[in-house]
Amino acid sequence: MSRILDRVDSPSDLKGLTTAELGILAEEIRQEIITVCSRNGGHLAPSLGVVELTLALHRVFTSPEDKIVWDVGHQAYAHKLVTGRRDRFATLRTLGGISGFLKRAESPHDVFDAGHASTSISAALGLAAARDLAGRNNKVVAVIGDGSMTGGIAYEGLNHAGHLNRDLVVVLNDNEMSIAENVGALSNFLSRTVTSEFVHTLKKDVETFLGGLDRIGRNVLKVAKRAEESLKGLFTPGMLFEAFGFEYIGPIDGHDIGRLTETFEKVKRFDDAVLIHVLTKKGKGFAPAEAKPSLFHGVGPFDPVSGEIVKGKGGATSYTGVFGQALTRIADEDERVVAITAAMPDGTGLGSFSARHPGRFFDVGIAEQHGVTFAAGLAAEGYRPVFAIYSSFLQRAYDQLFHDVCLMNLPVTFAIDRSGVVGSDGPTHHGLFDLSYLRTLPNMVVMAPKDENELQHMLKTAIDHNGPAAVRYPRGNGLGVPLDQSLAPIPLGTSEVLRAGSGTCVVLAVGAMVGPALEAANTLEGEGIDLTVVNVRFVKPLDRELILSYVGRAGTLVTIEENVLQGGFGSAVLELLADEGVGGVAVHRFGYPDRYVEQGEQHELRSRYGLDAEGIAGRIRTLSAR
């Protein structure tokens, strides 16, 4: 028997389906998402939670004429399946396949690229303003999760939208979670829910009737408004959004397609800013994901029946795990150490720290800007905060790094996870810019370990340093080296010669590139090319003395970094040589080009860009033949 899903090639195909057929389709979509994610990994639980919401939106609104803006994109899989990408869905998150996020280049139904949180309201408001300037009358809808509502930009968008009072629909998808459980006053506030969509129509009718009467009628209207505000404020979160200038409708069962459809049909007739509060269950339809939504938020391959995660090859602890263990040990001995995360306690390895030192652990929500300045405040009072954060998310707080940390030379440590290419999440999540944007900041120390043991010592170095310091490390397992129990700081700006070759080529490798550089050197040795390999350790401050010492002896310097070449470590070396007036040495920079790197497994991307051992050996072989 054929699936209804196989007959859905565009959102228009949903409009002729009955509510019962849409219910069947919802389950078919869930099964498709589970099947593909079990092989490819992906953001399973968020997408399972919004299937009915997605179908109702596409049934009522006419995409792409009507613009549906999805926040983050974690919940976009059902949207992709009903917008013409069913036949390619099996390629989700693979090299050359469809993205796990929204991509304008992929489909006209993806009206705004997404990957980071809290941007949808601002983007949708811009689309609505453009519509009005052009004299069009299409609808614009932003779909944002309650987790994304912990980000400040969401409120900047709400504030501006309420001021402009444009024809804009915001759907708040409330599953009481972002990645882990939500934190903060907003989460508590949203749990106070009771009202319905008929209130909007009723209020308009009453206002029209009383407003048309004499002064007594208008006074009654004022009293009624005050009474409504007082009572609603006791029971609902609607007051918050109405204070921003939005009409508030909800909460609505986000899995009731009929109710959702009815509500969206009514809202289509409104011409002002409306917020619809929808309640959903993260992971719905897959029992393991419903039971452990955080585990299945972003998950690797798993058994599609039991939900058991497919374990990779055994071996070394991940860099994230080693970081968490080392930080906990350091905090055991130093009461000044506190840990901060932006809604990712498990993803950044802080689970053991939060259990051991709950009073010194802070989850700030998806609020990176606040997190950095919060850390600065702690540091200003003598504490040693460690902000564990993914490289791509730290970008969101650049001015806070400059203004609130580095300007005052405050001792804040940034533990930058997921540096380099991260894999299938693609360009929004690769950590390929941190060396460039961090080394430009005065007072900032920037380190990258060659292995997980060196990571421990660099963490100790950063915490002991009386100023800002960053340690960047990759996603994935370490190299399996022994872990020292006693940790000591590394002298700032010192590198380490790991292989002293007799040839004229010196390789300066950063962090995760040290291992492939050594492998390449071993390969080339058998071909008569004897490389010197240096573990740089510090991108800032540079080991000026060592680098300059090789200038007179080496004909070629090769810098290798898992970062974009623009402004990175190789650029720092060139700047040093230019400042010193040094010539007579060829400098070749290996890294990522001036482009956004596509999705793919880490090993696939490193191979494609010549940054695995084979690629490095091949490029140096070519240089040596010149």
Curated annotation (Swiss-Prot):
Q: According to its record, what are the GO cellular component terms?
A: cytosol
Q: Specify the domain of life of the species encoding this protein.
A: Bacteria
The alphabetized list of GO BP terms reads:
1-deoxy-D-xylulose 5-phosphate biosynthetic process; isopentenyl diphosphate biosynthetic process, methylerythritol 4-phosphate pathway; terpenoid biosynthetic process; thiamine biosynthetic process
> What catalytic reaction does the record list?
D-glyceraldehyde 3-phosphate + pyruvate + H(+) = 1-deoxy-D-xylulose 5-phosphate + CO2
A GO MF label: 1-deoxy-D-xylulose-5-phosphate synthase activity
Q: Which CDD domains match?
A: TPP_DXS (cd02007), TPP_PYR_DXS_TK_like (cd07033)
Q: In which pathway does it act?
A: Metabolic intermediate biosynthesis; 1-deoxy-D-xylulose 5-phosphate biosynthesis; 1-deoxy-D-xylulose 5-phosphate from D-glyceraldehyde 3-phosphate and pyruvate: step 1/1
Enzyme Commission (EC) number: 2.2.1.7
What is this protein called in UniProt? 1-deoxy-D-xylulose-5-phosphate synthase 2
Taxonomic source organism: Geobacter sulfurreducens (strain ATCC 51573 / DSM 12127 / PCA)
Question: What's the gene?
Answer: dxs2
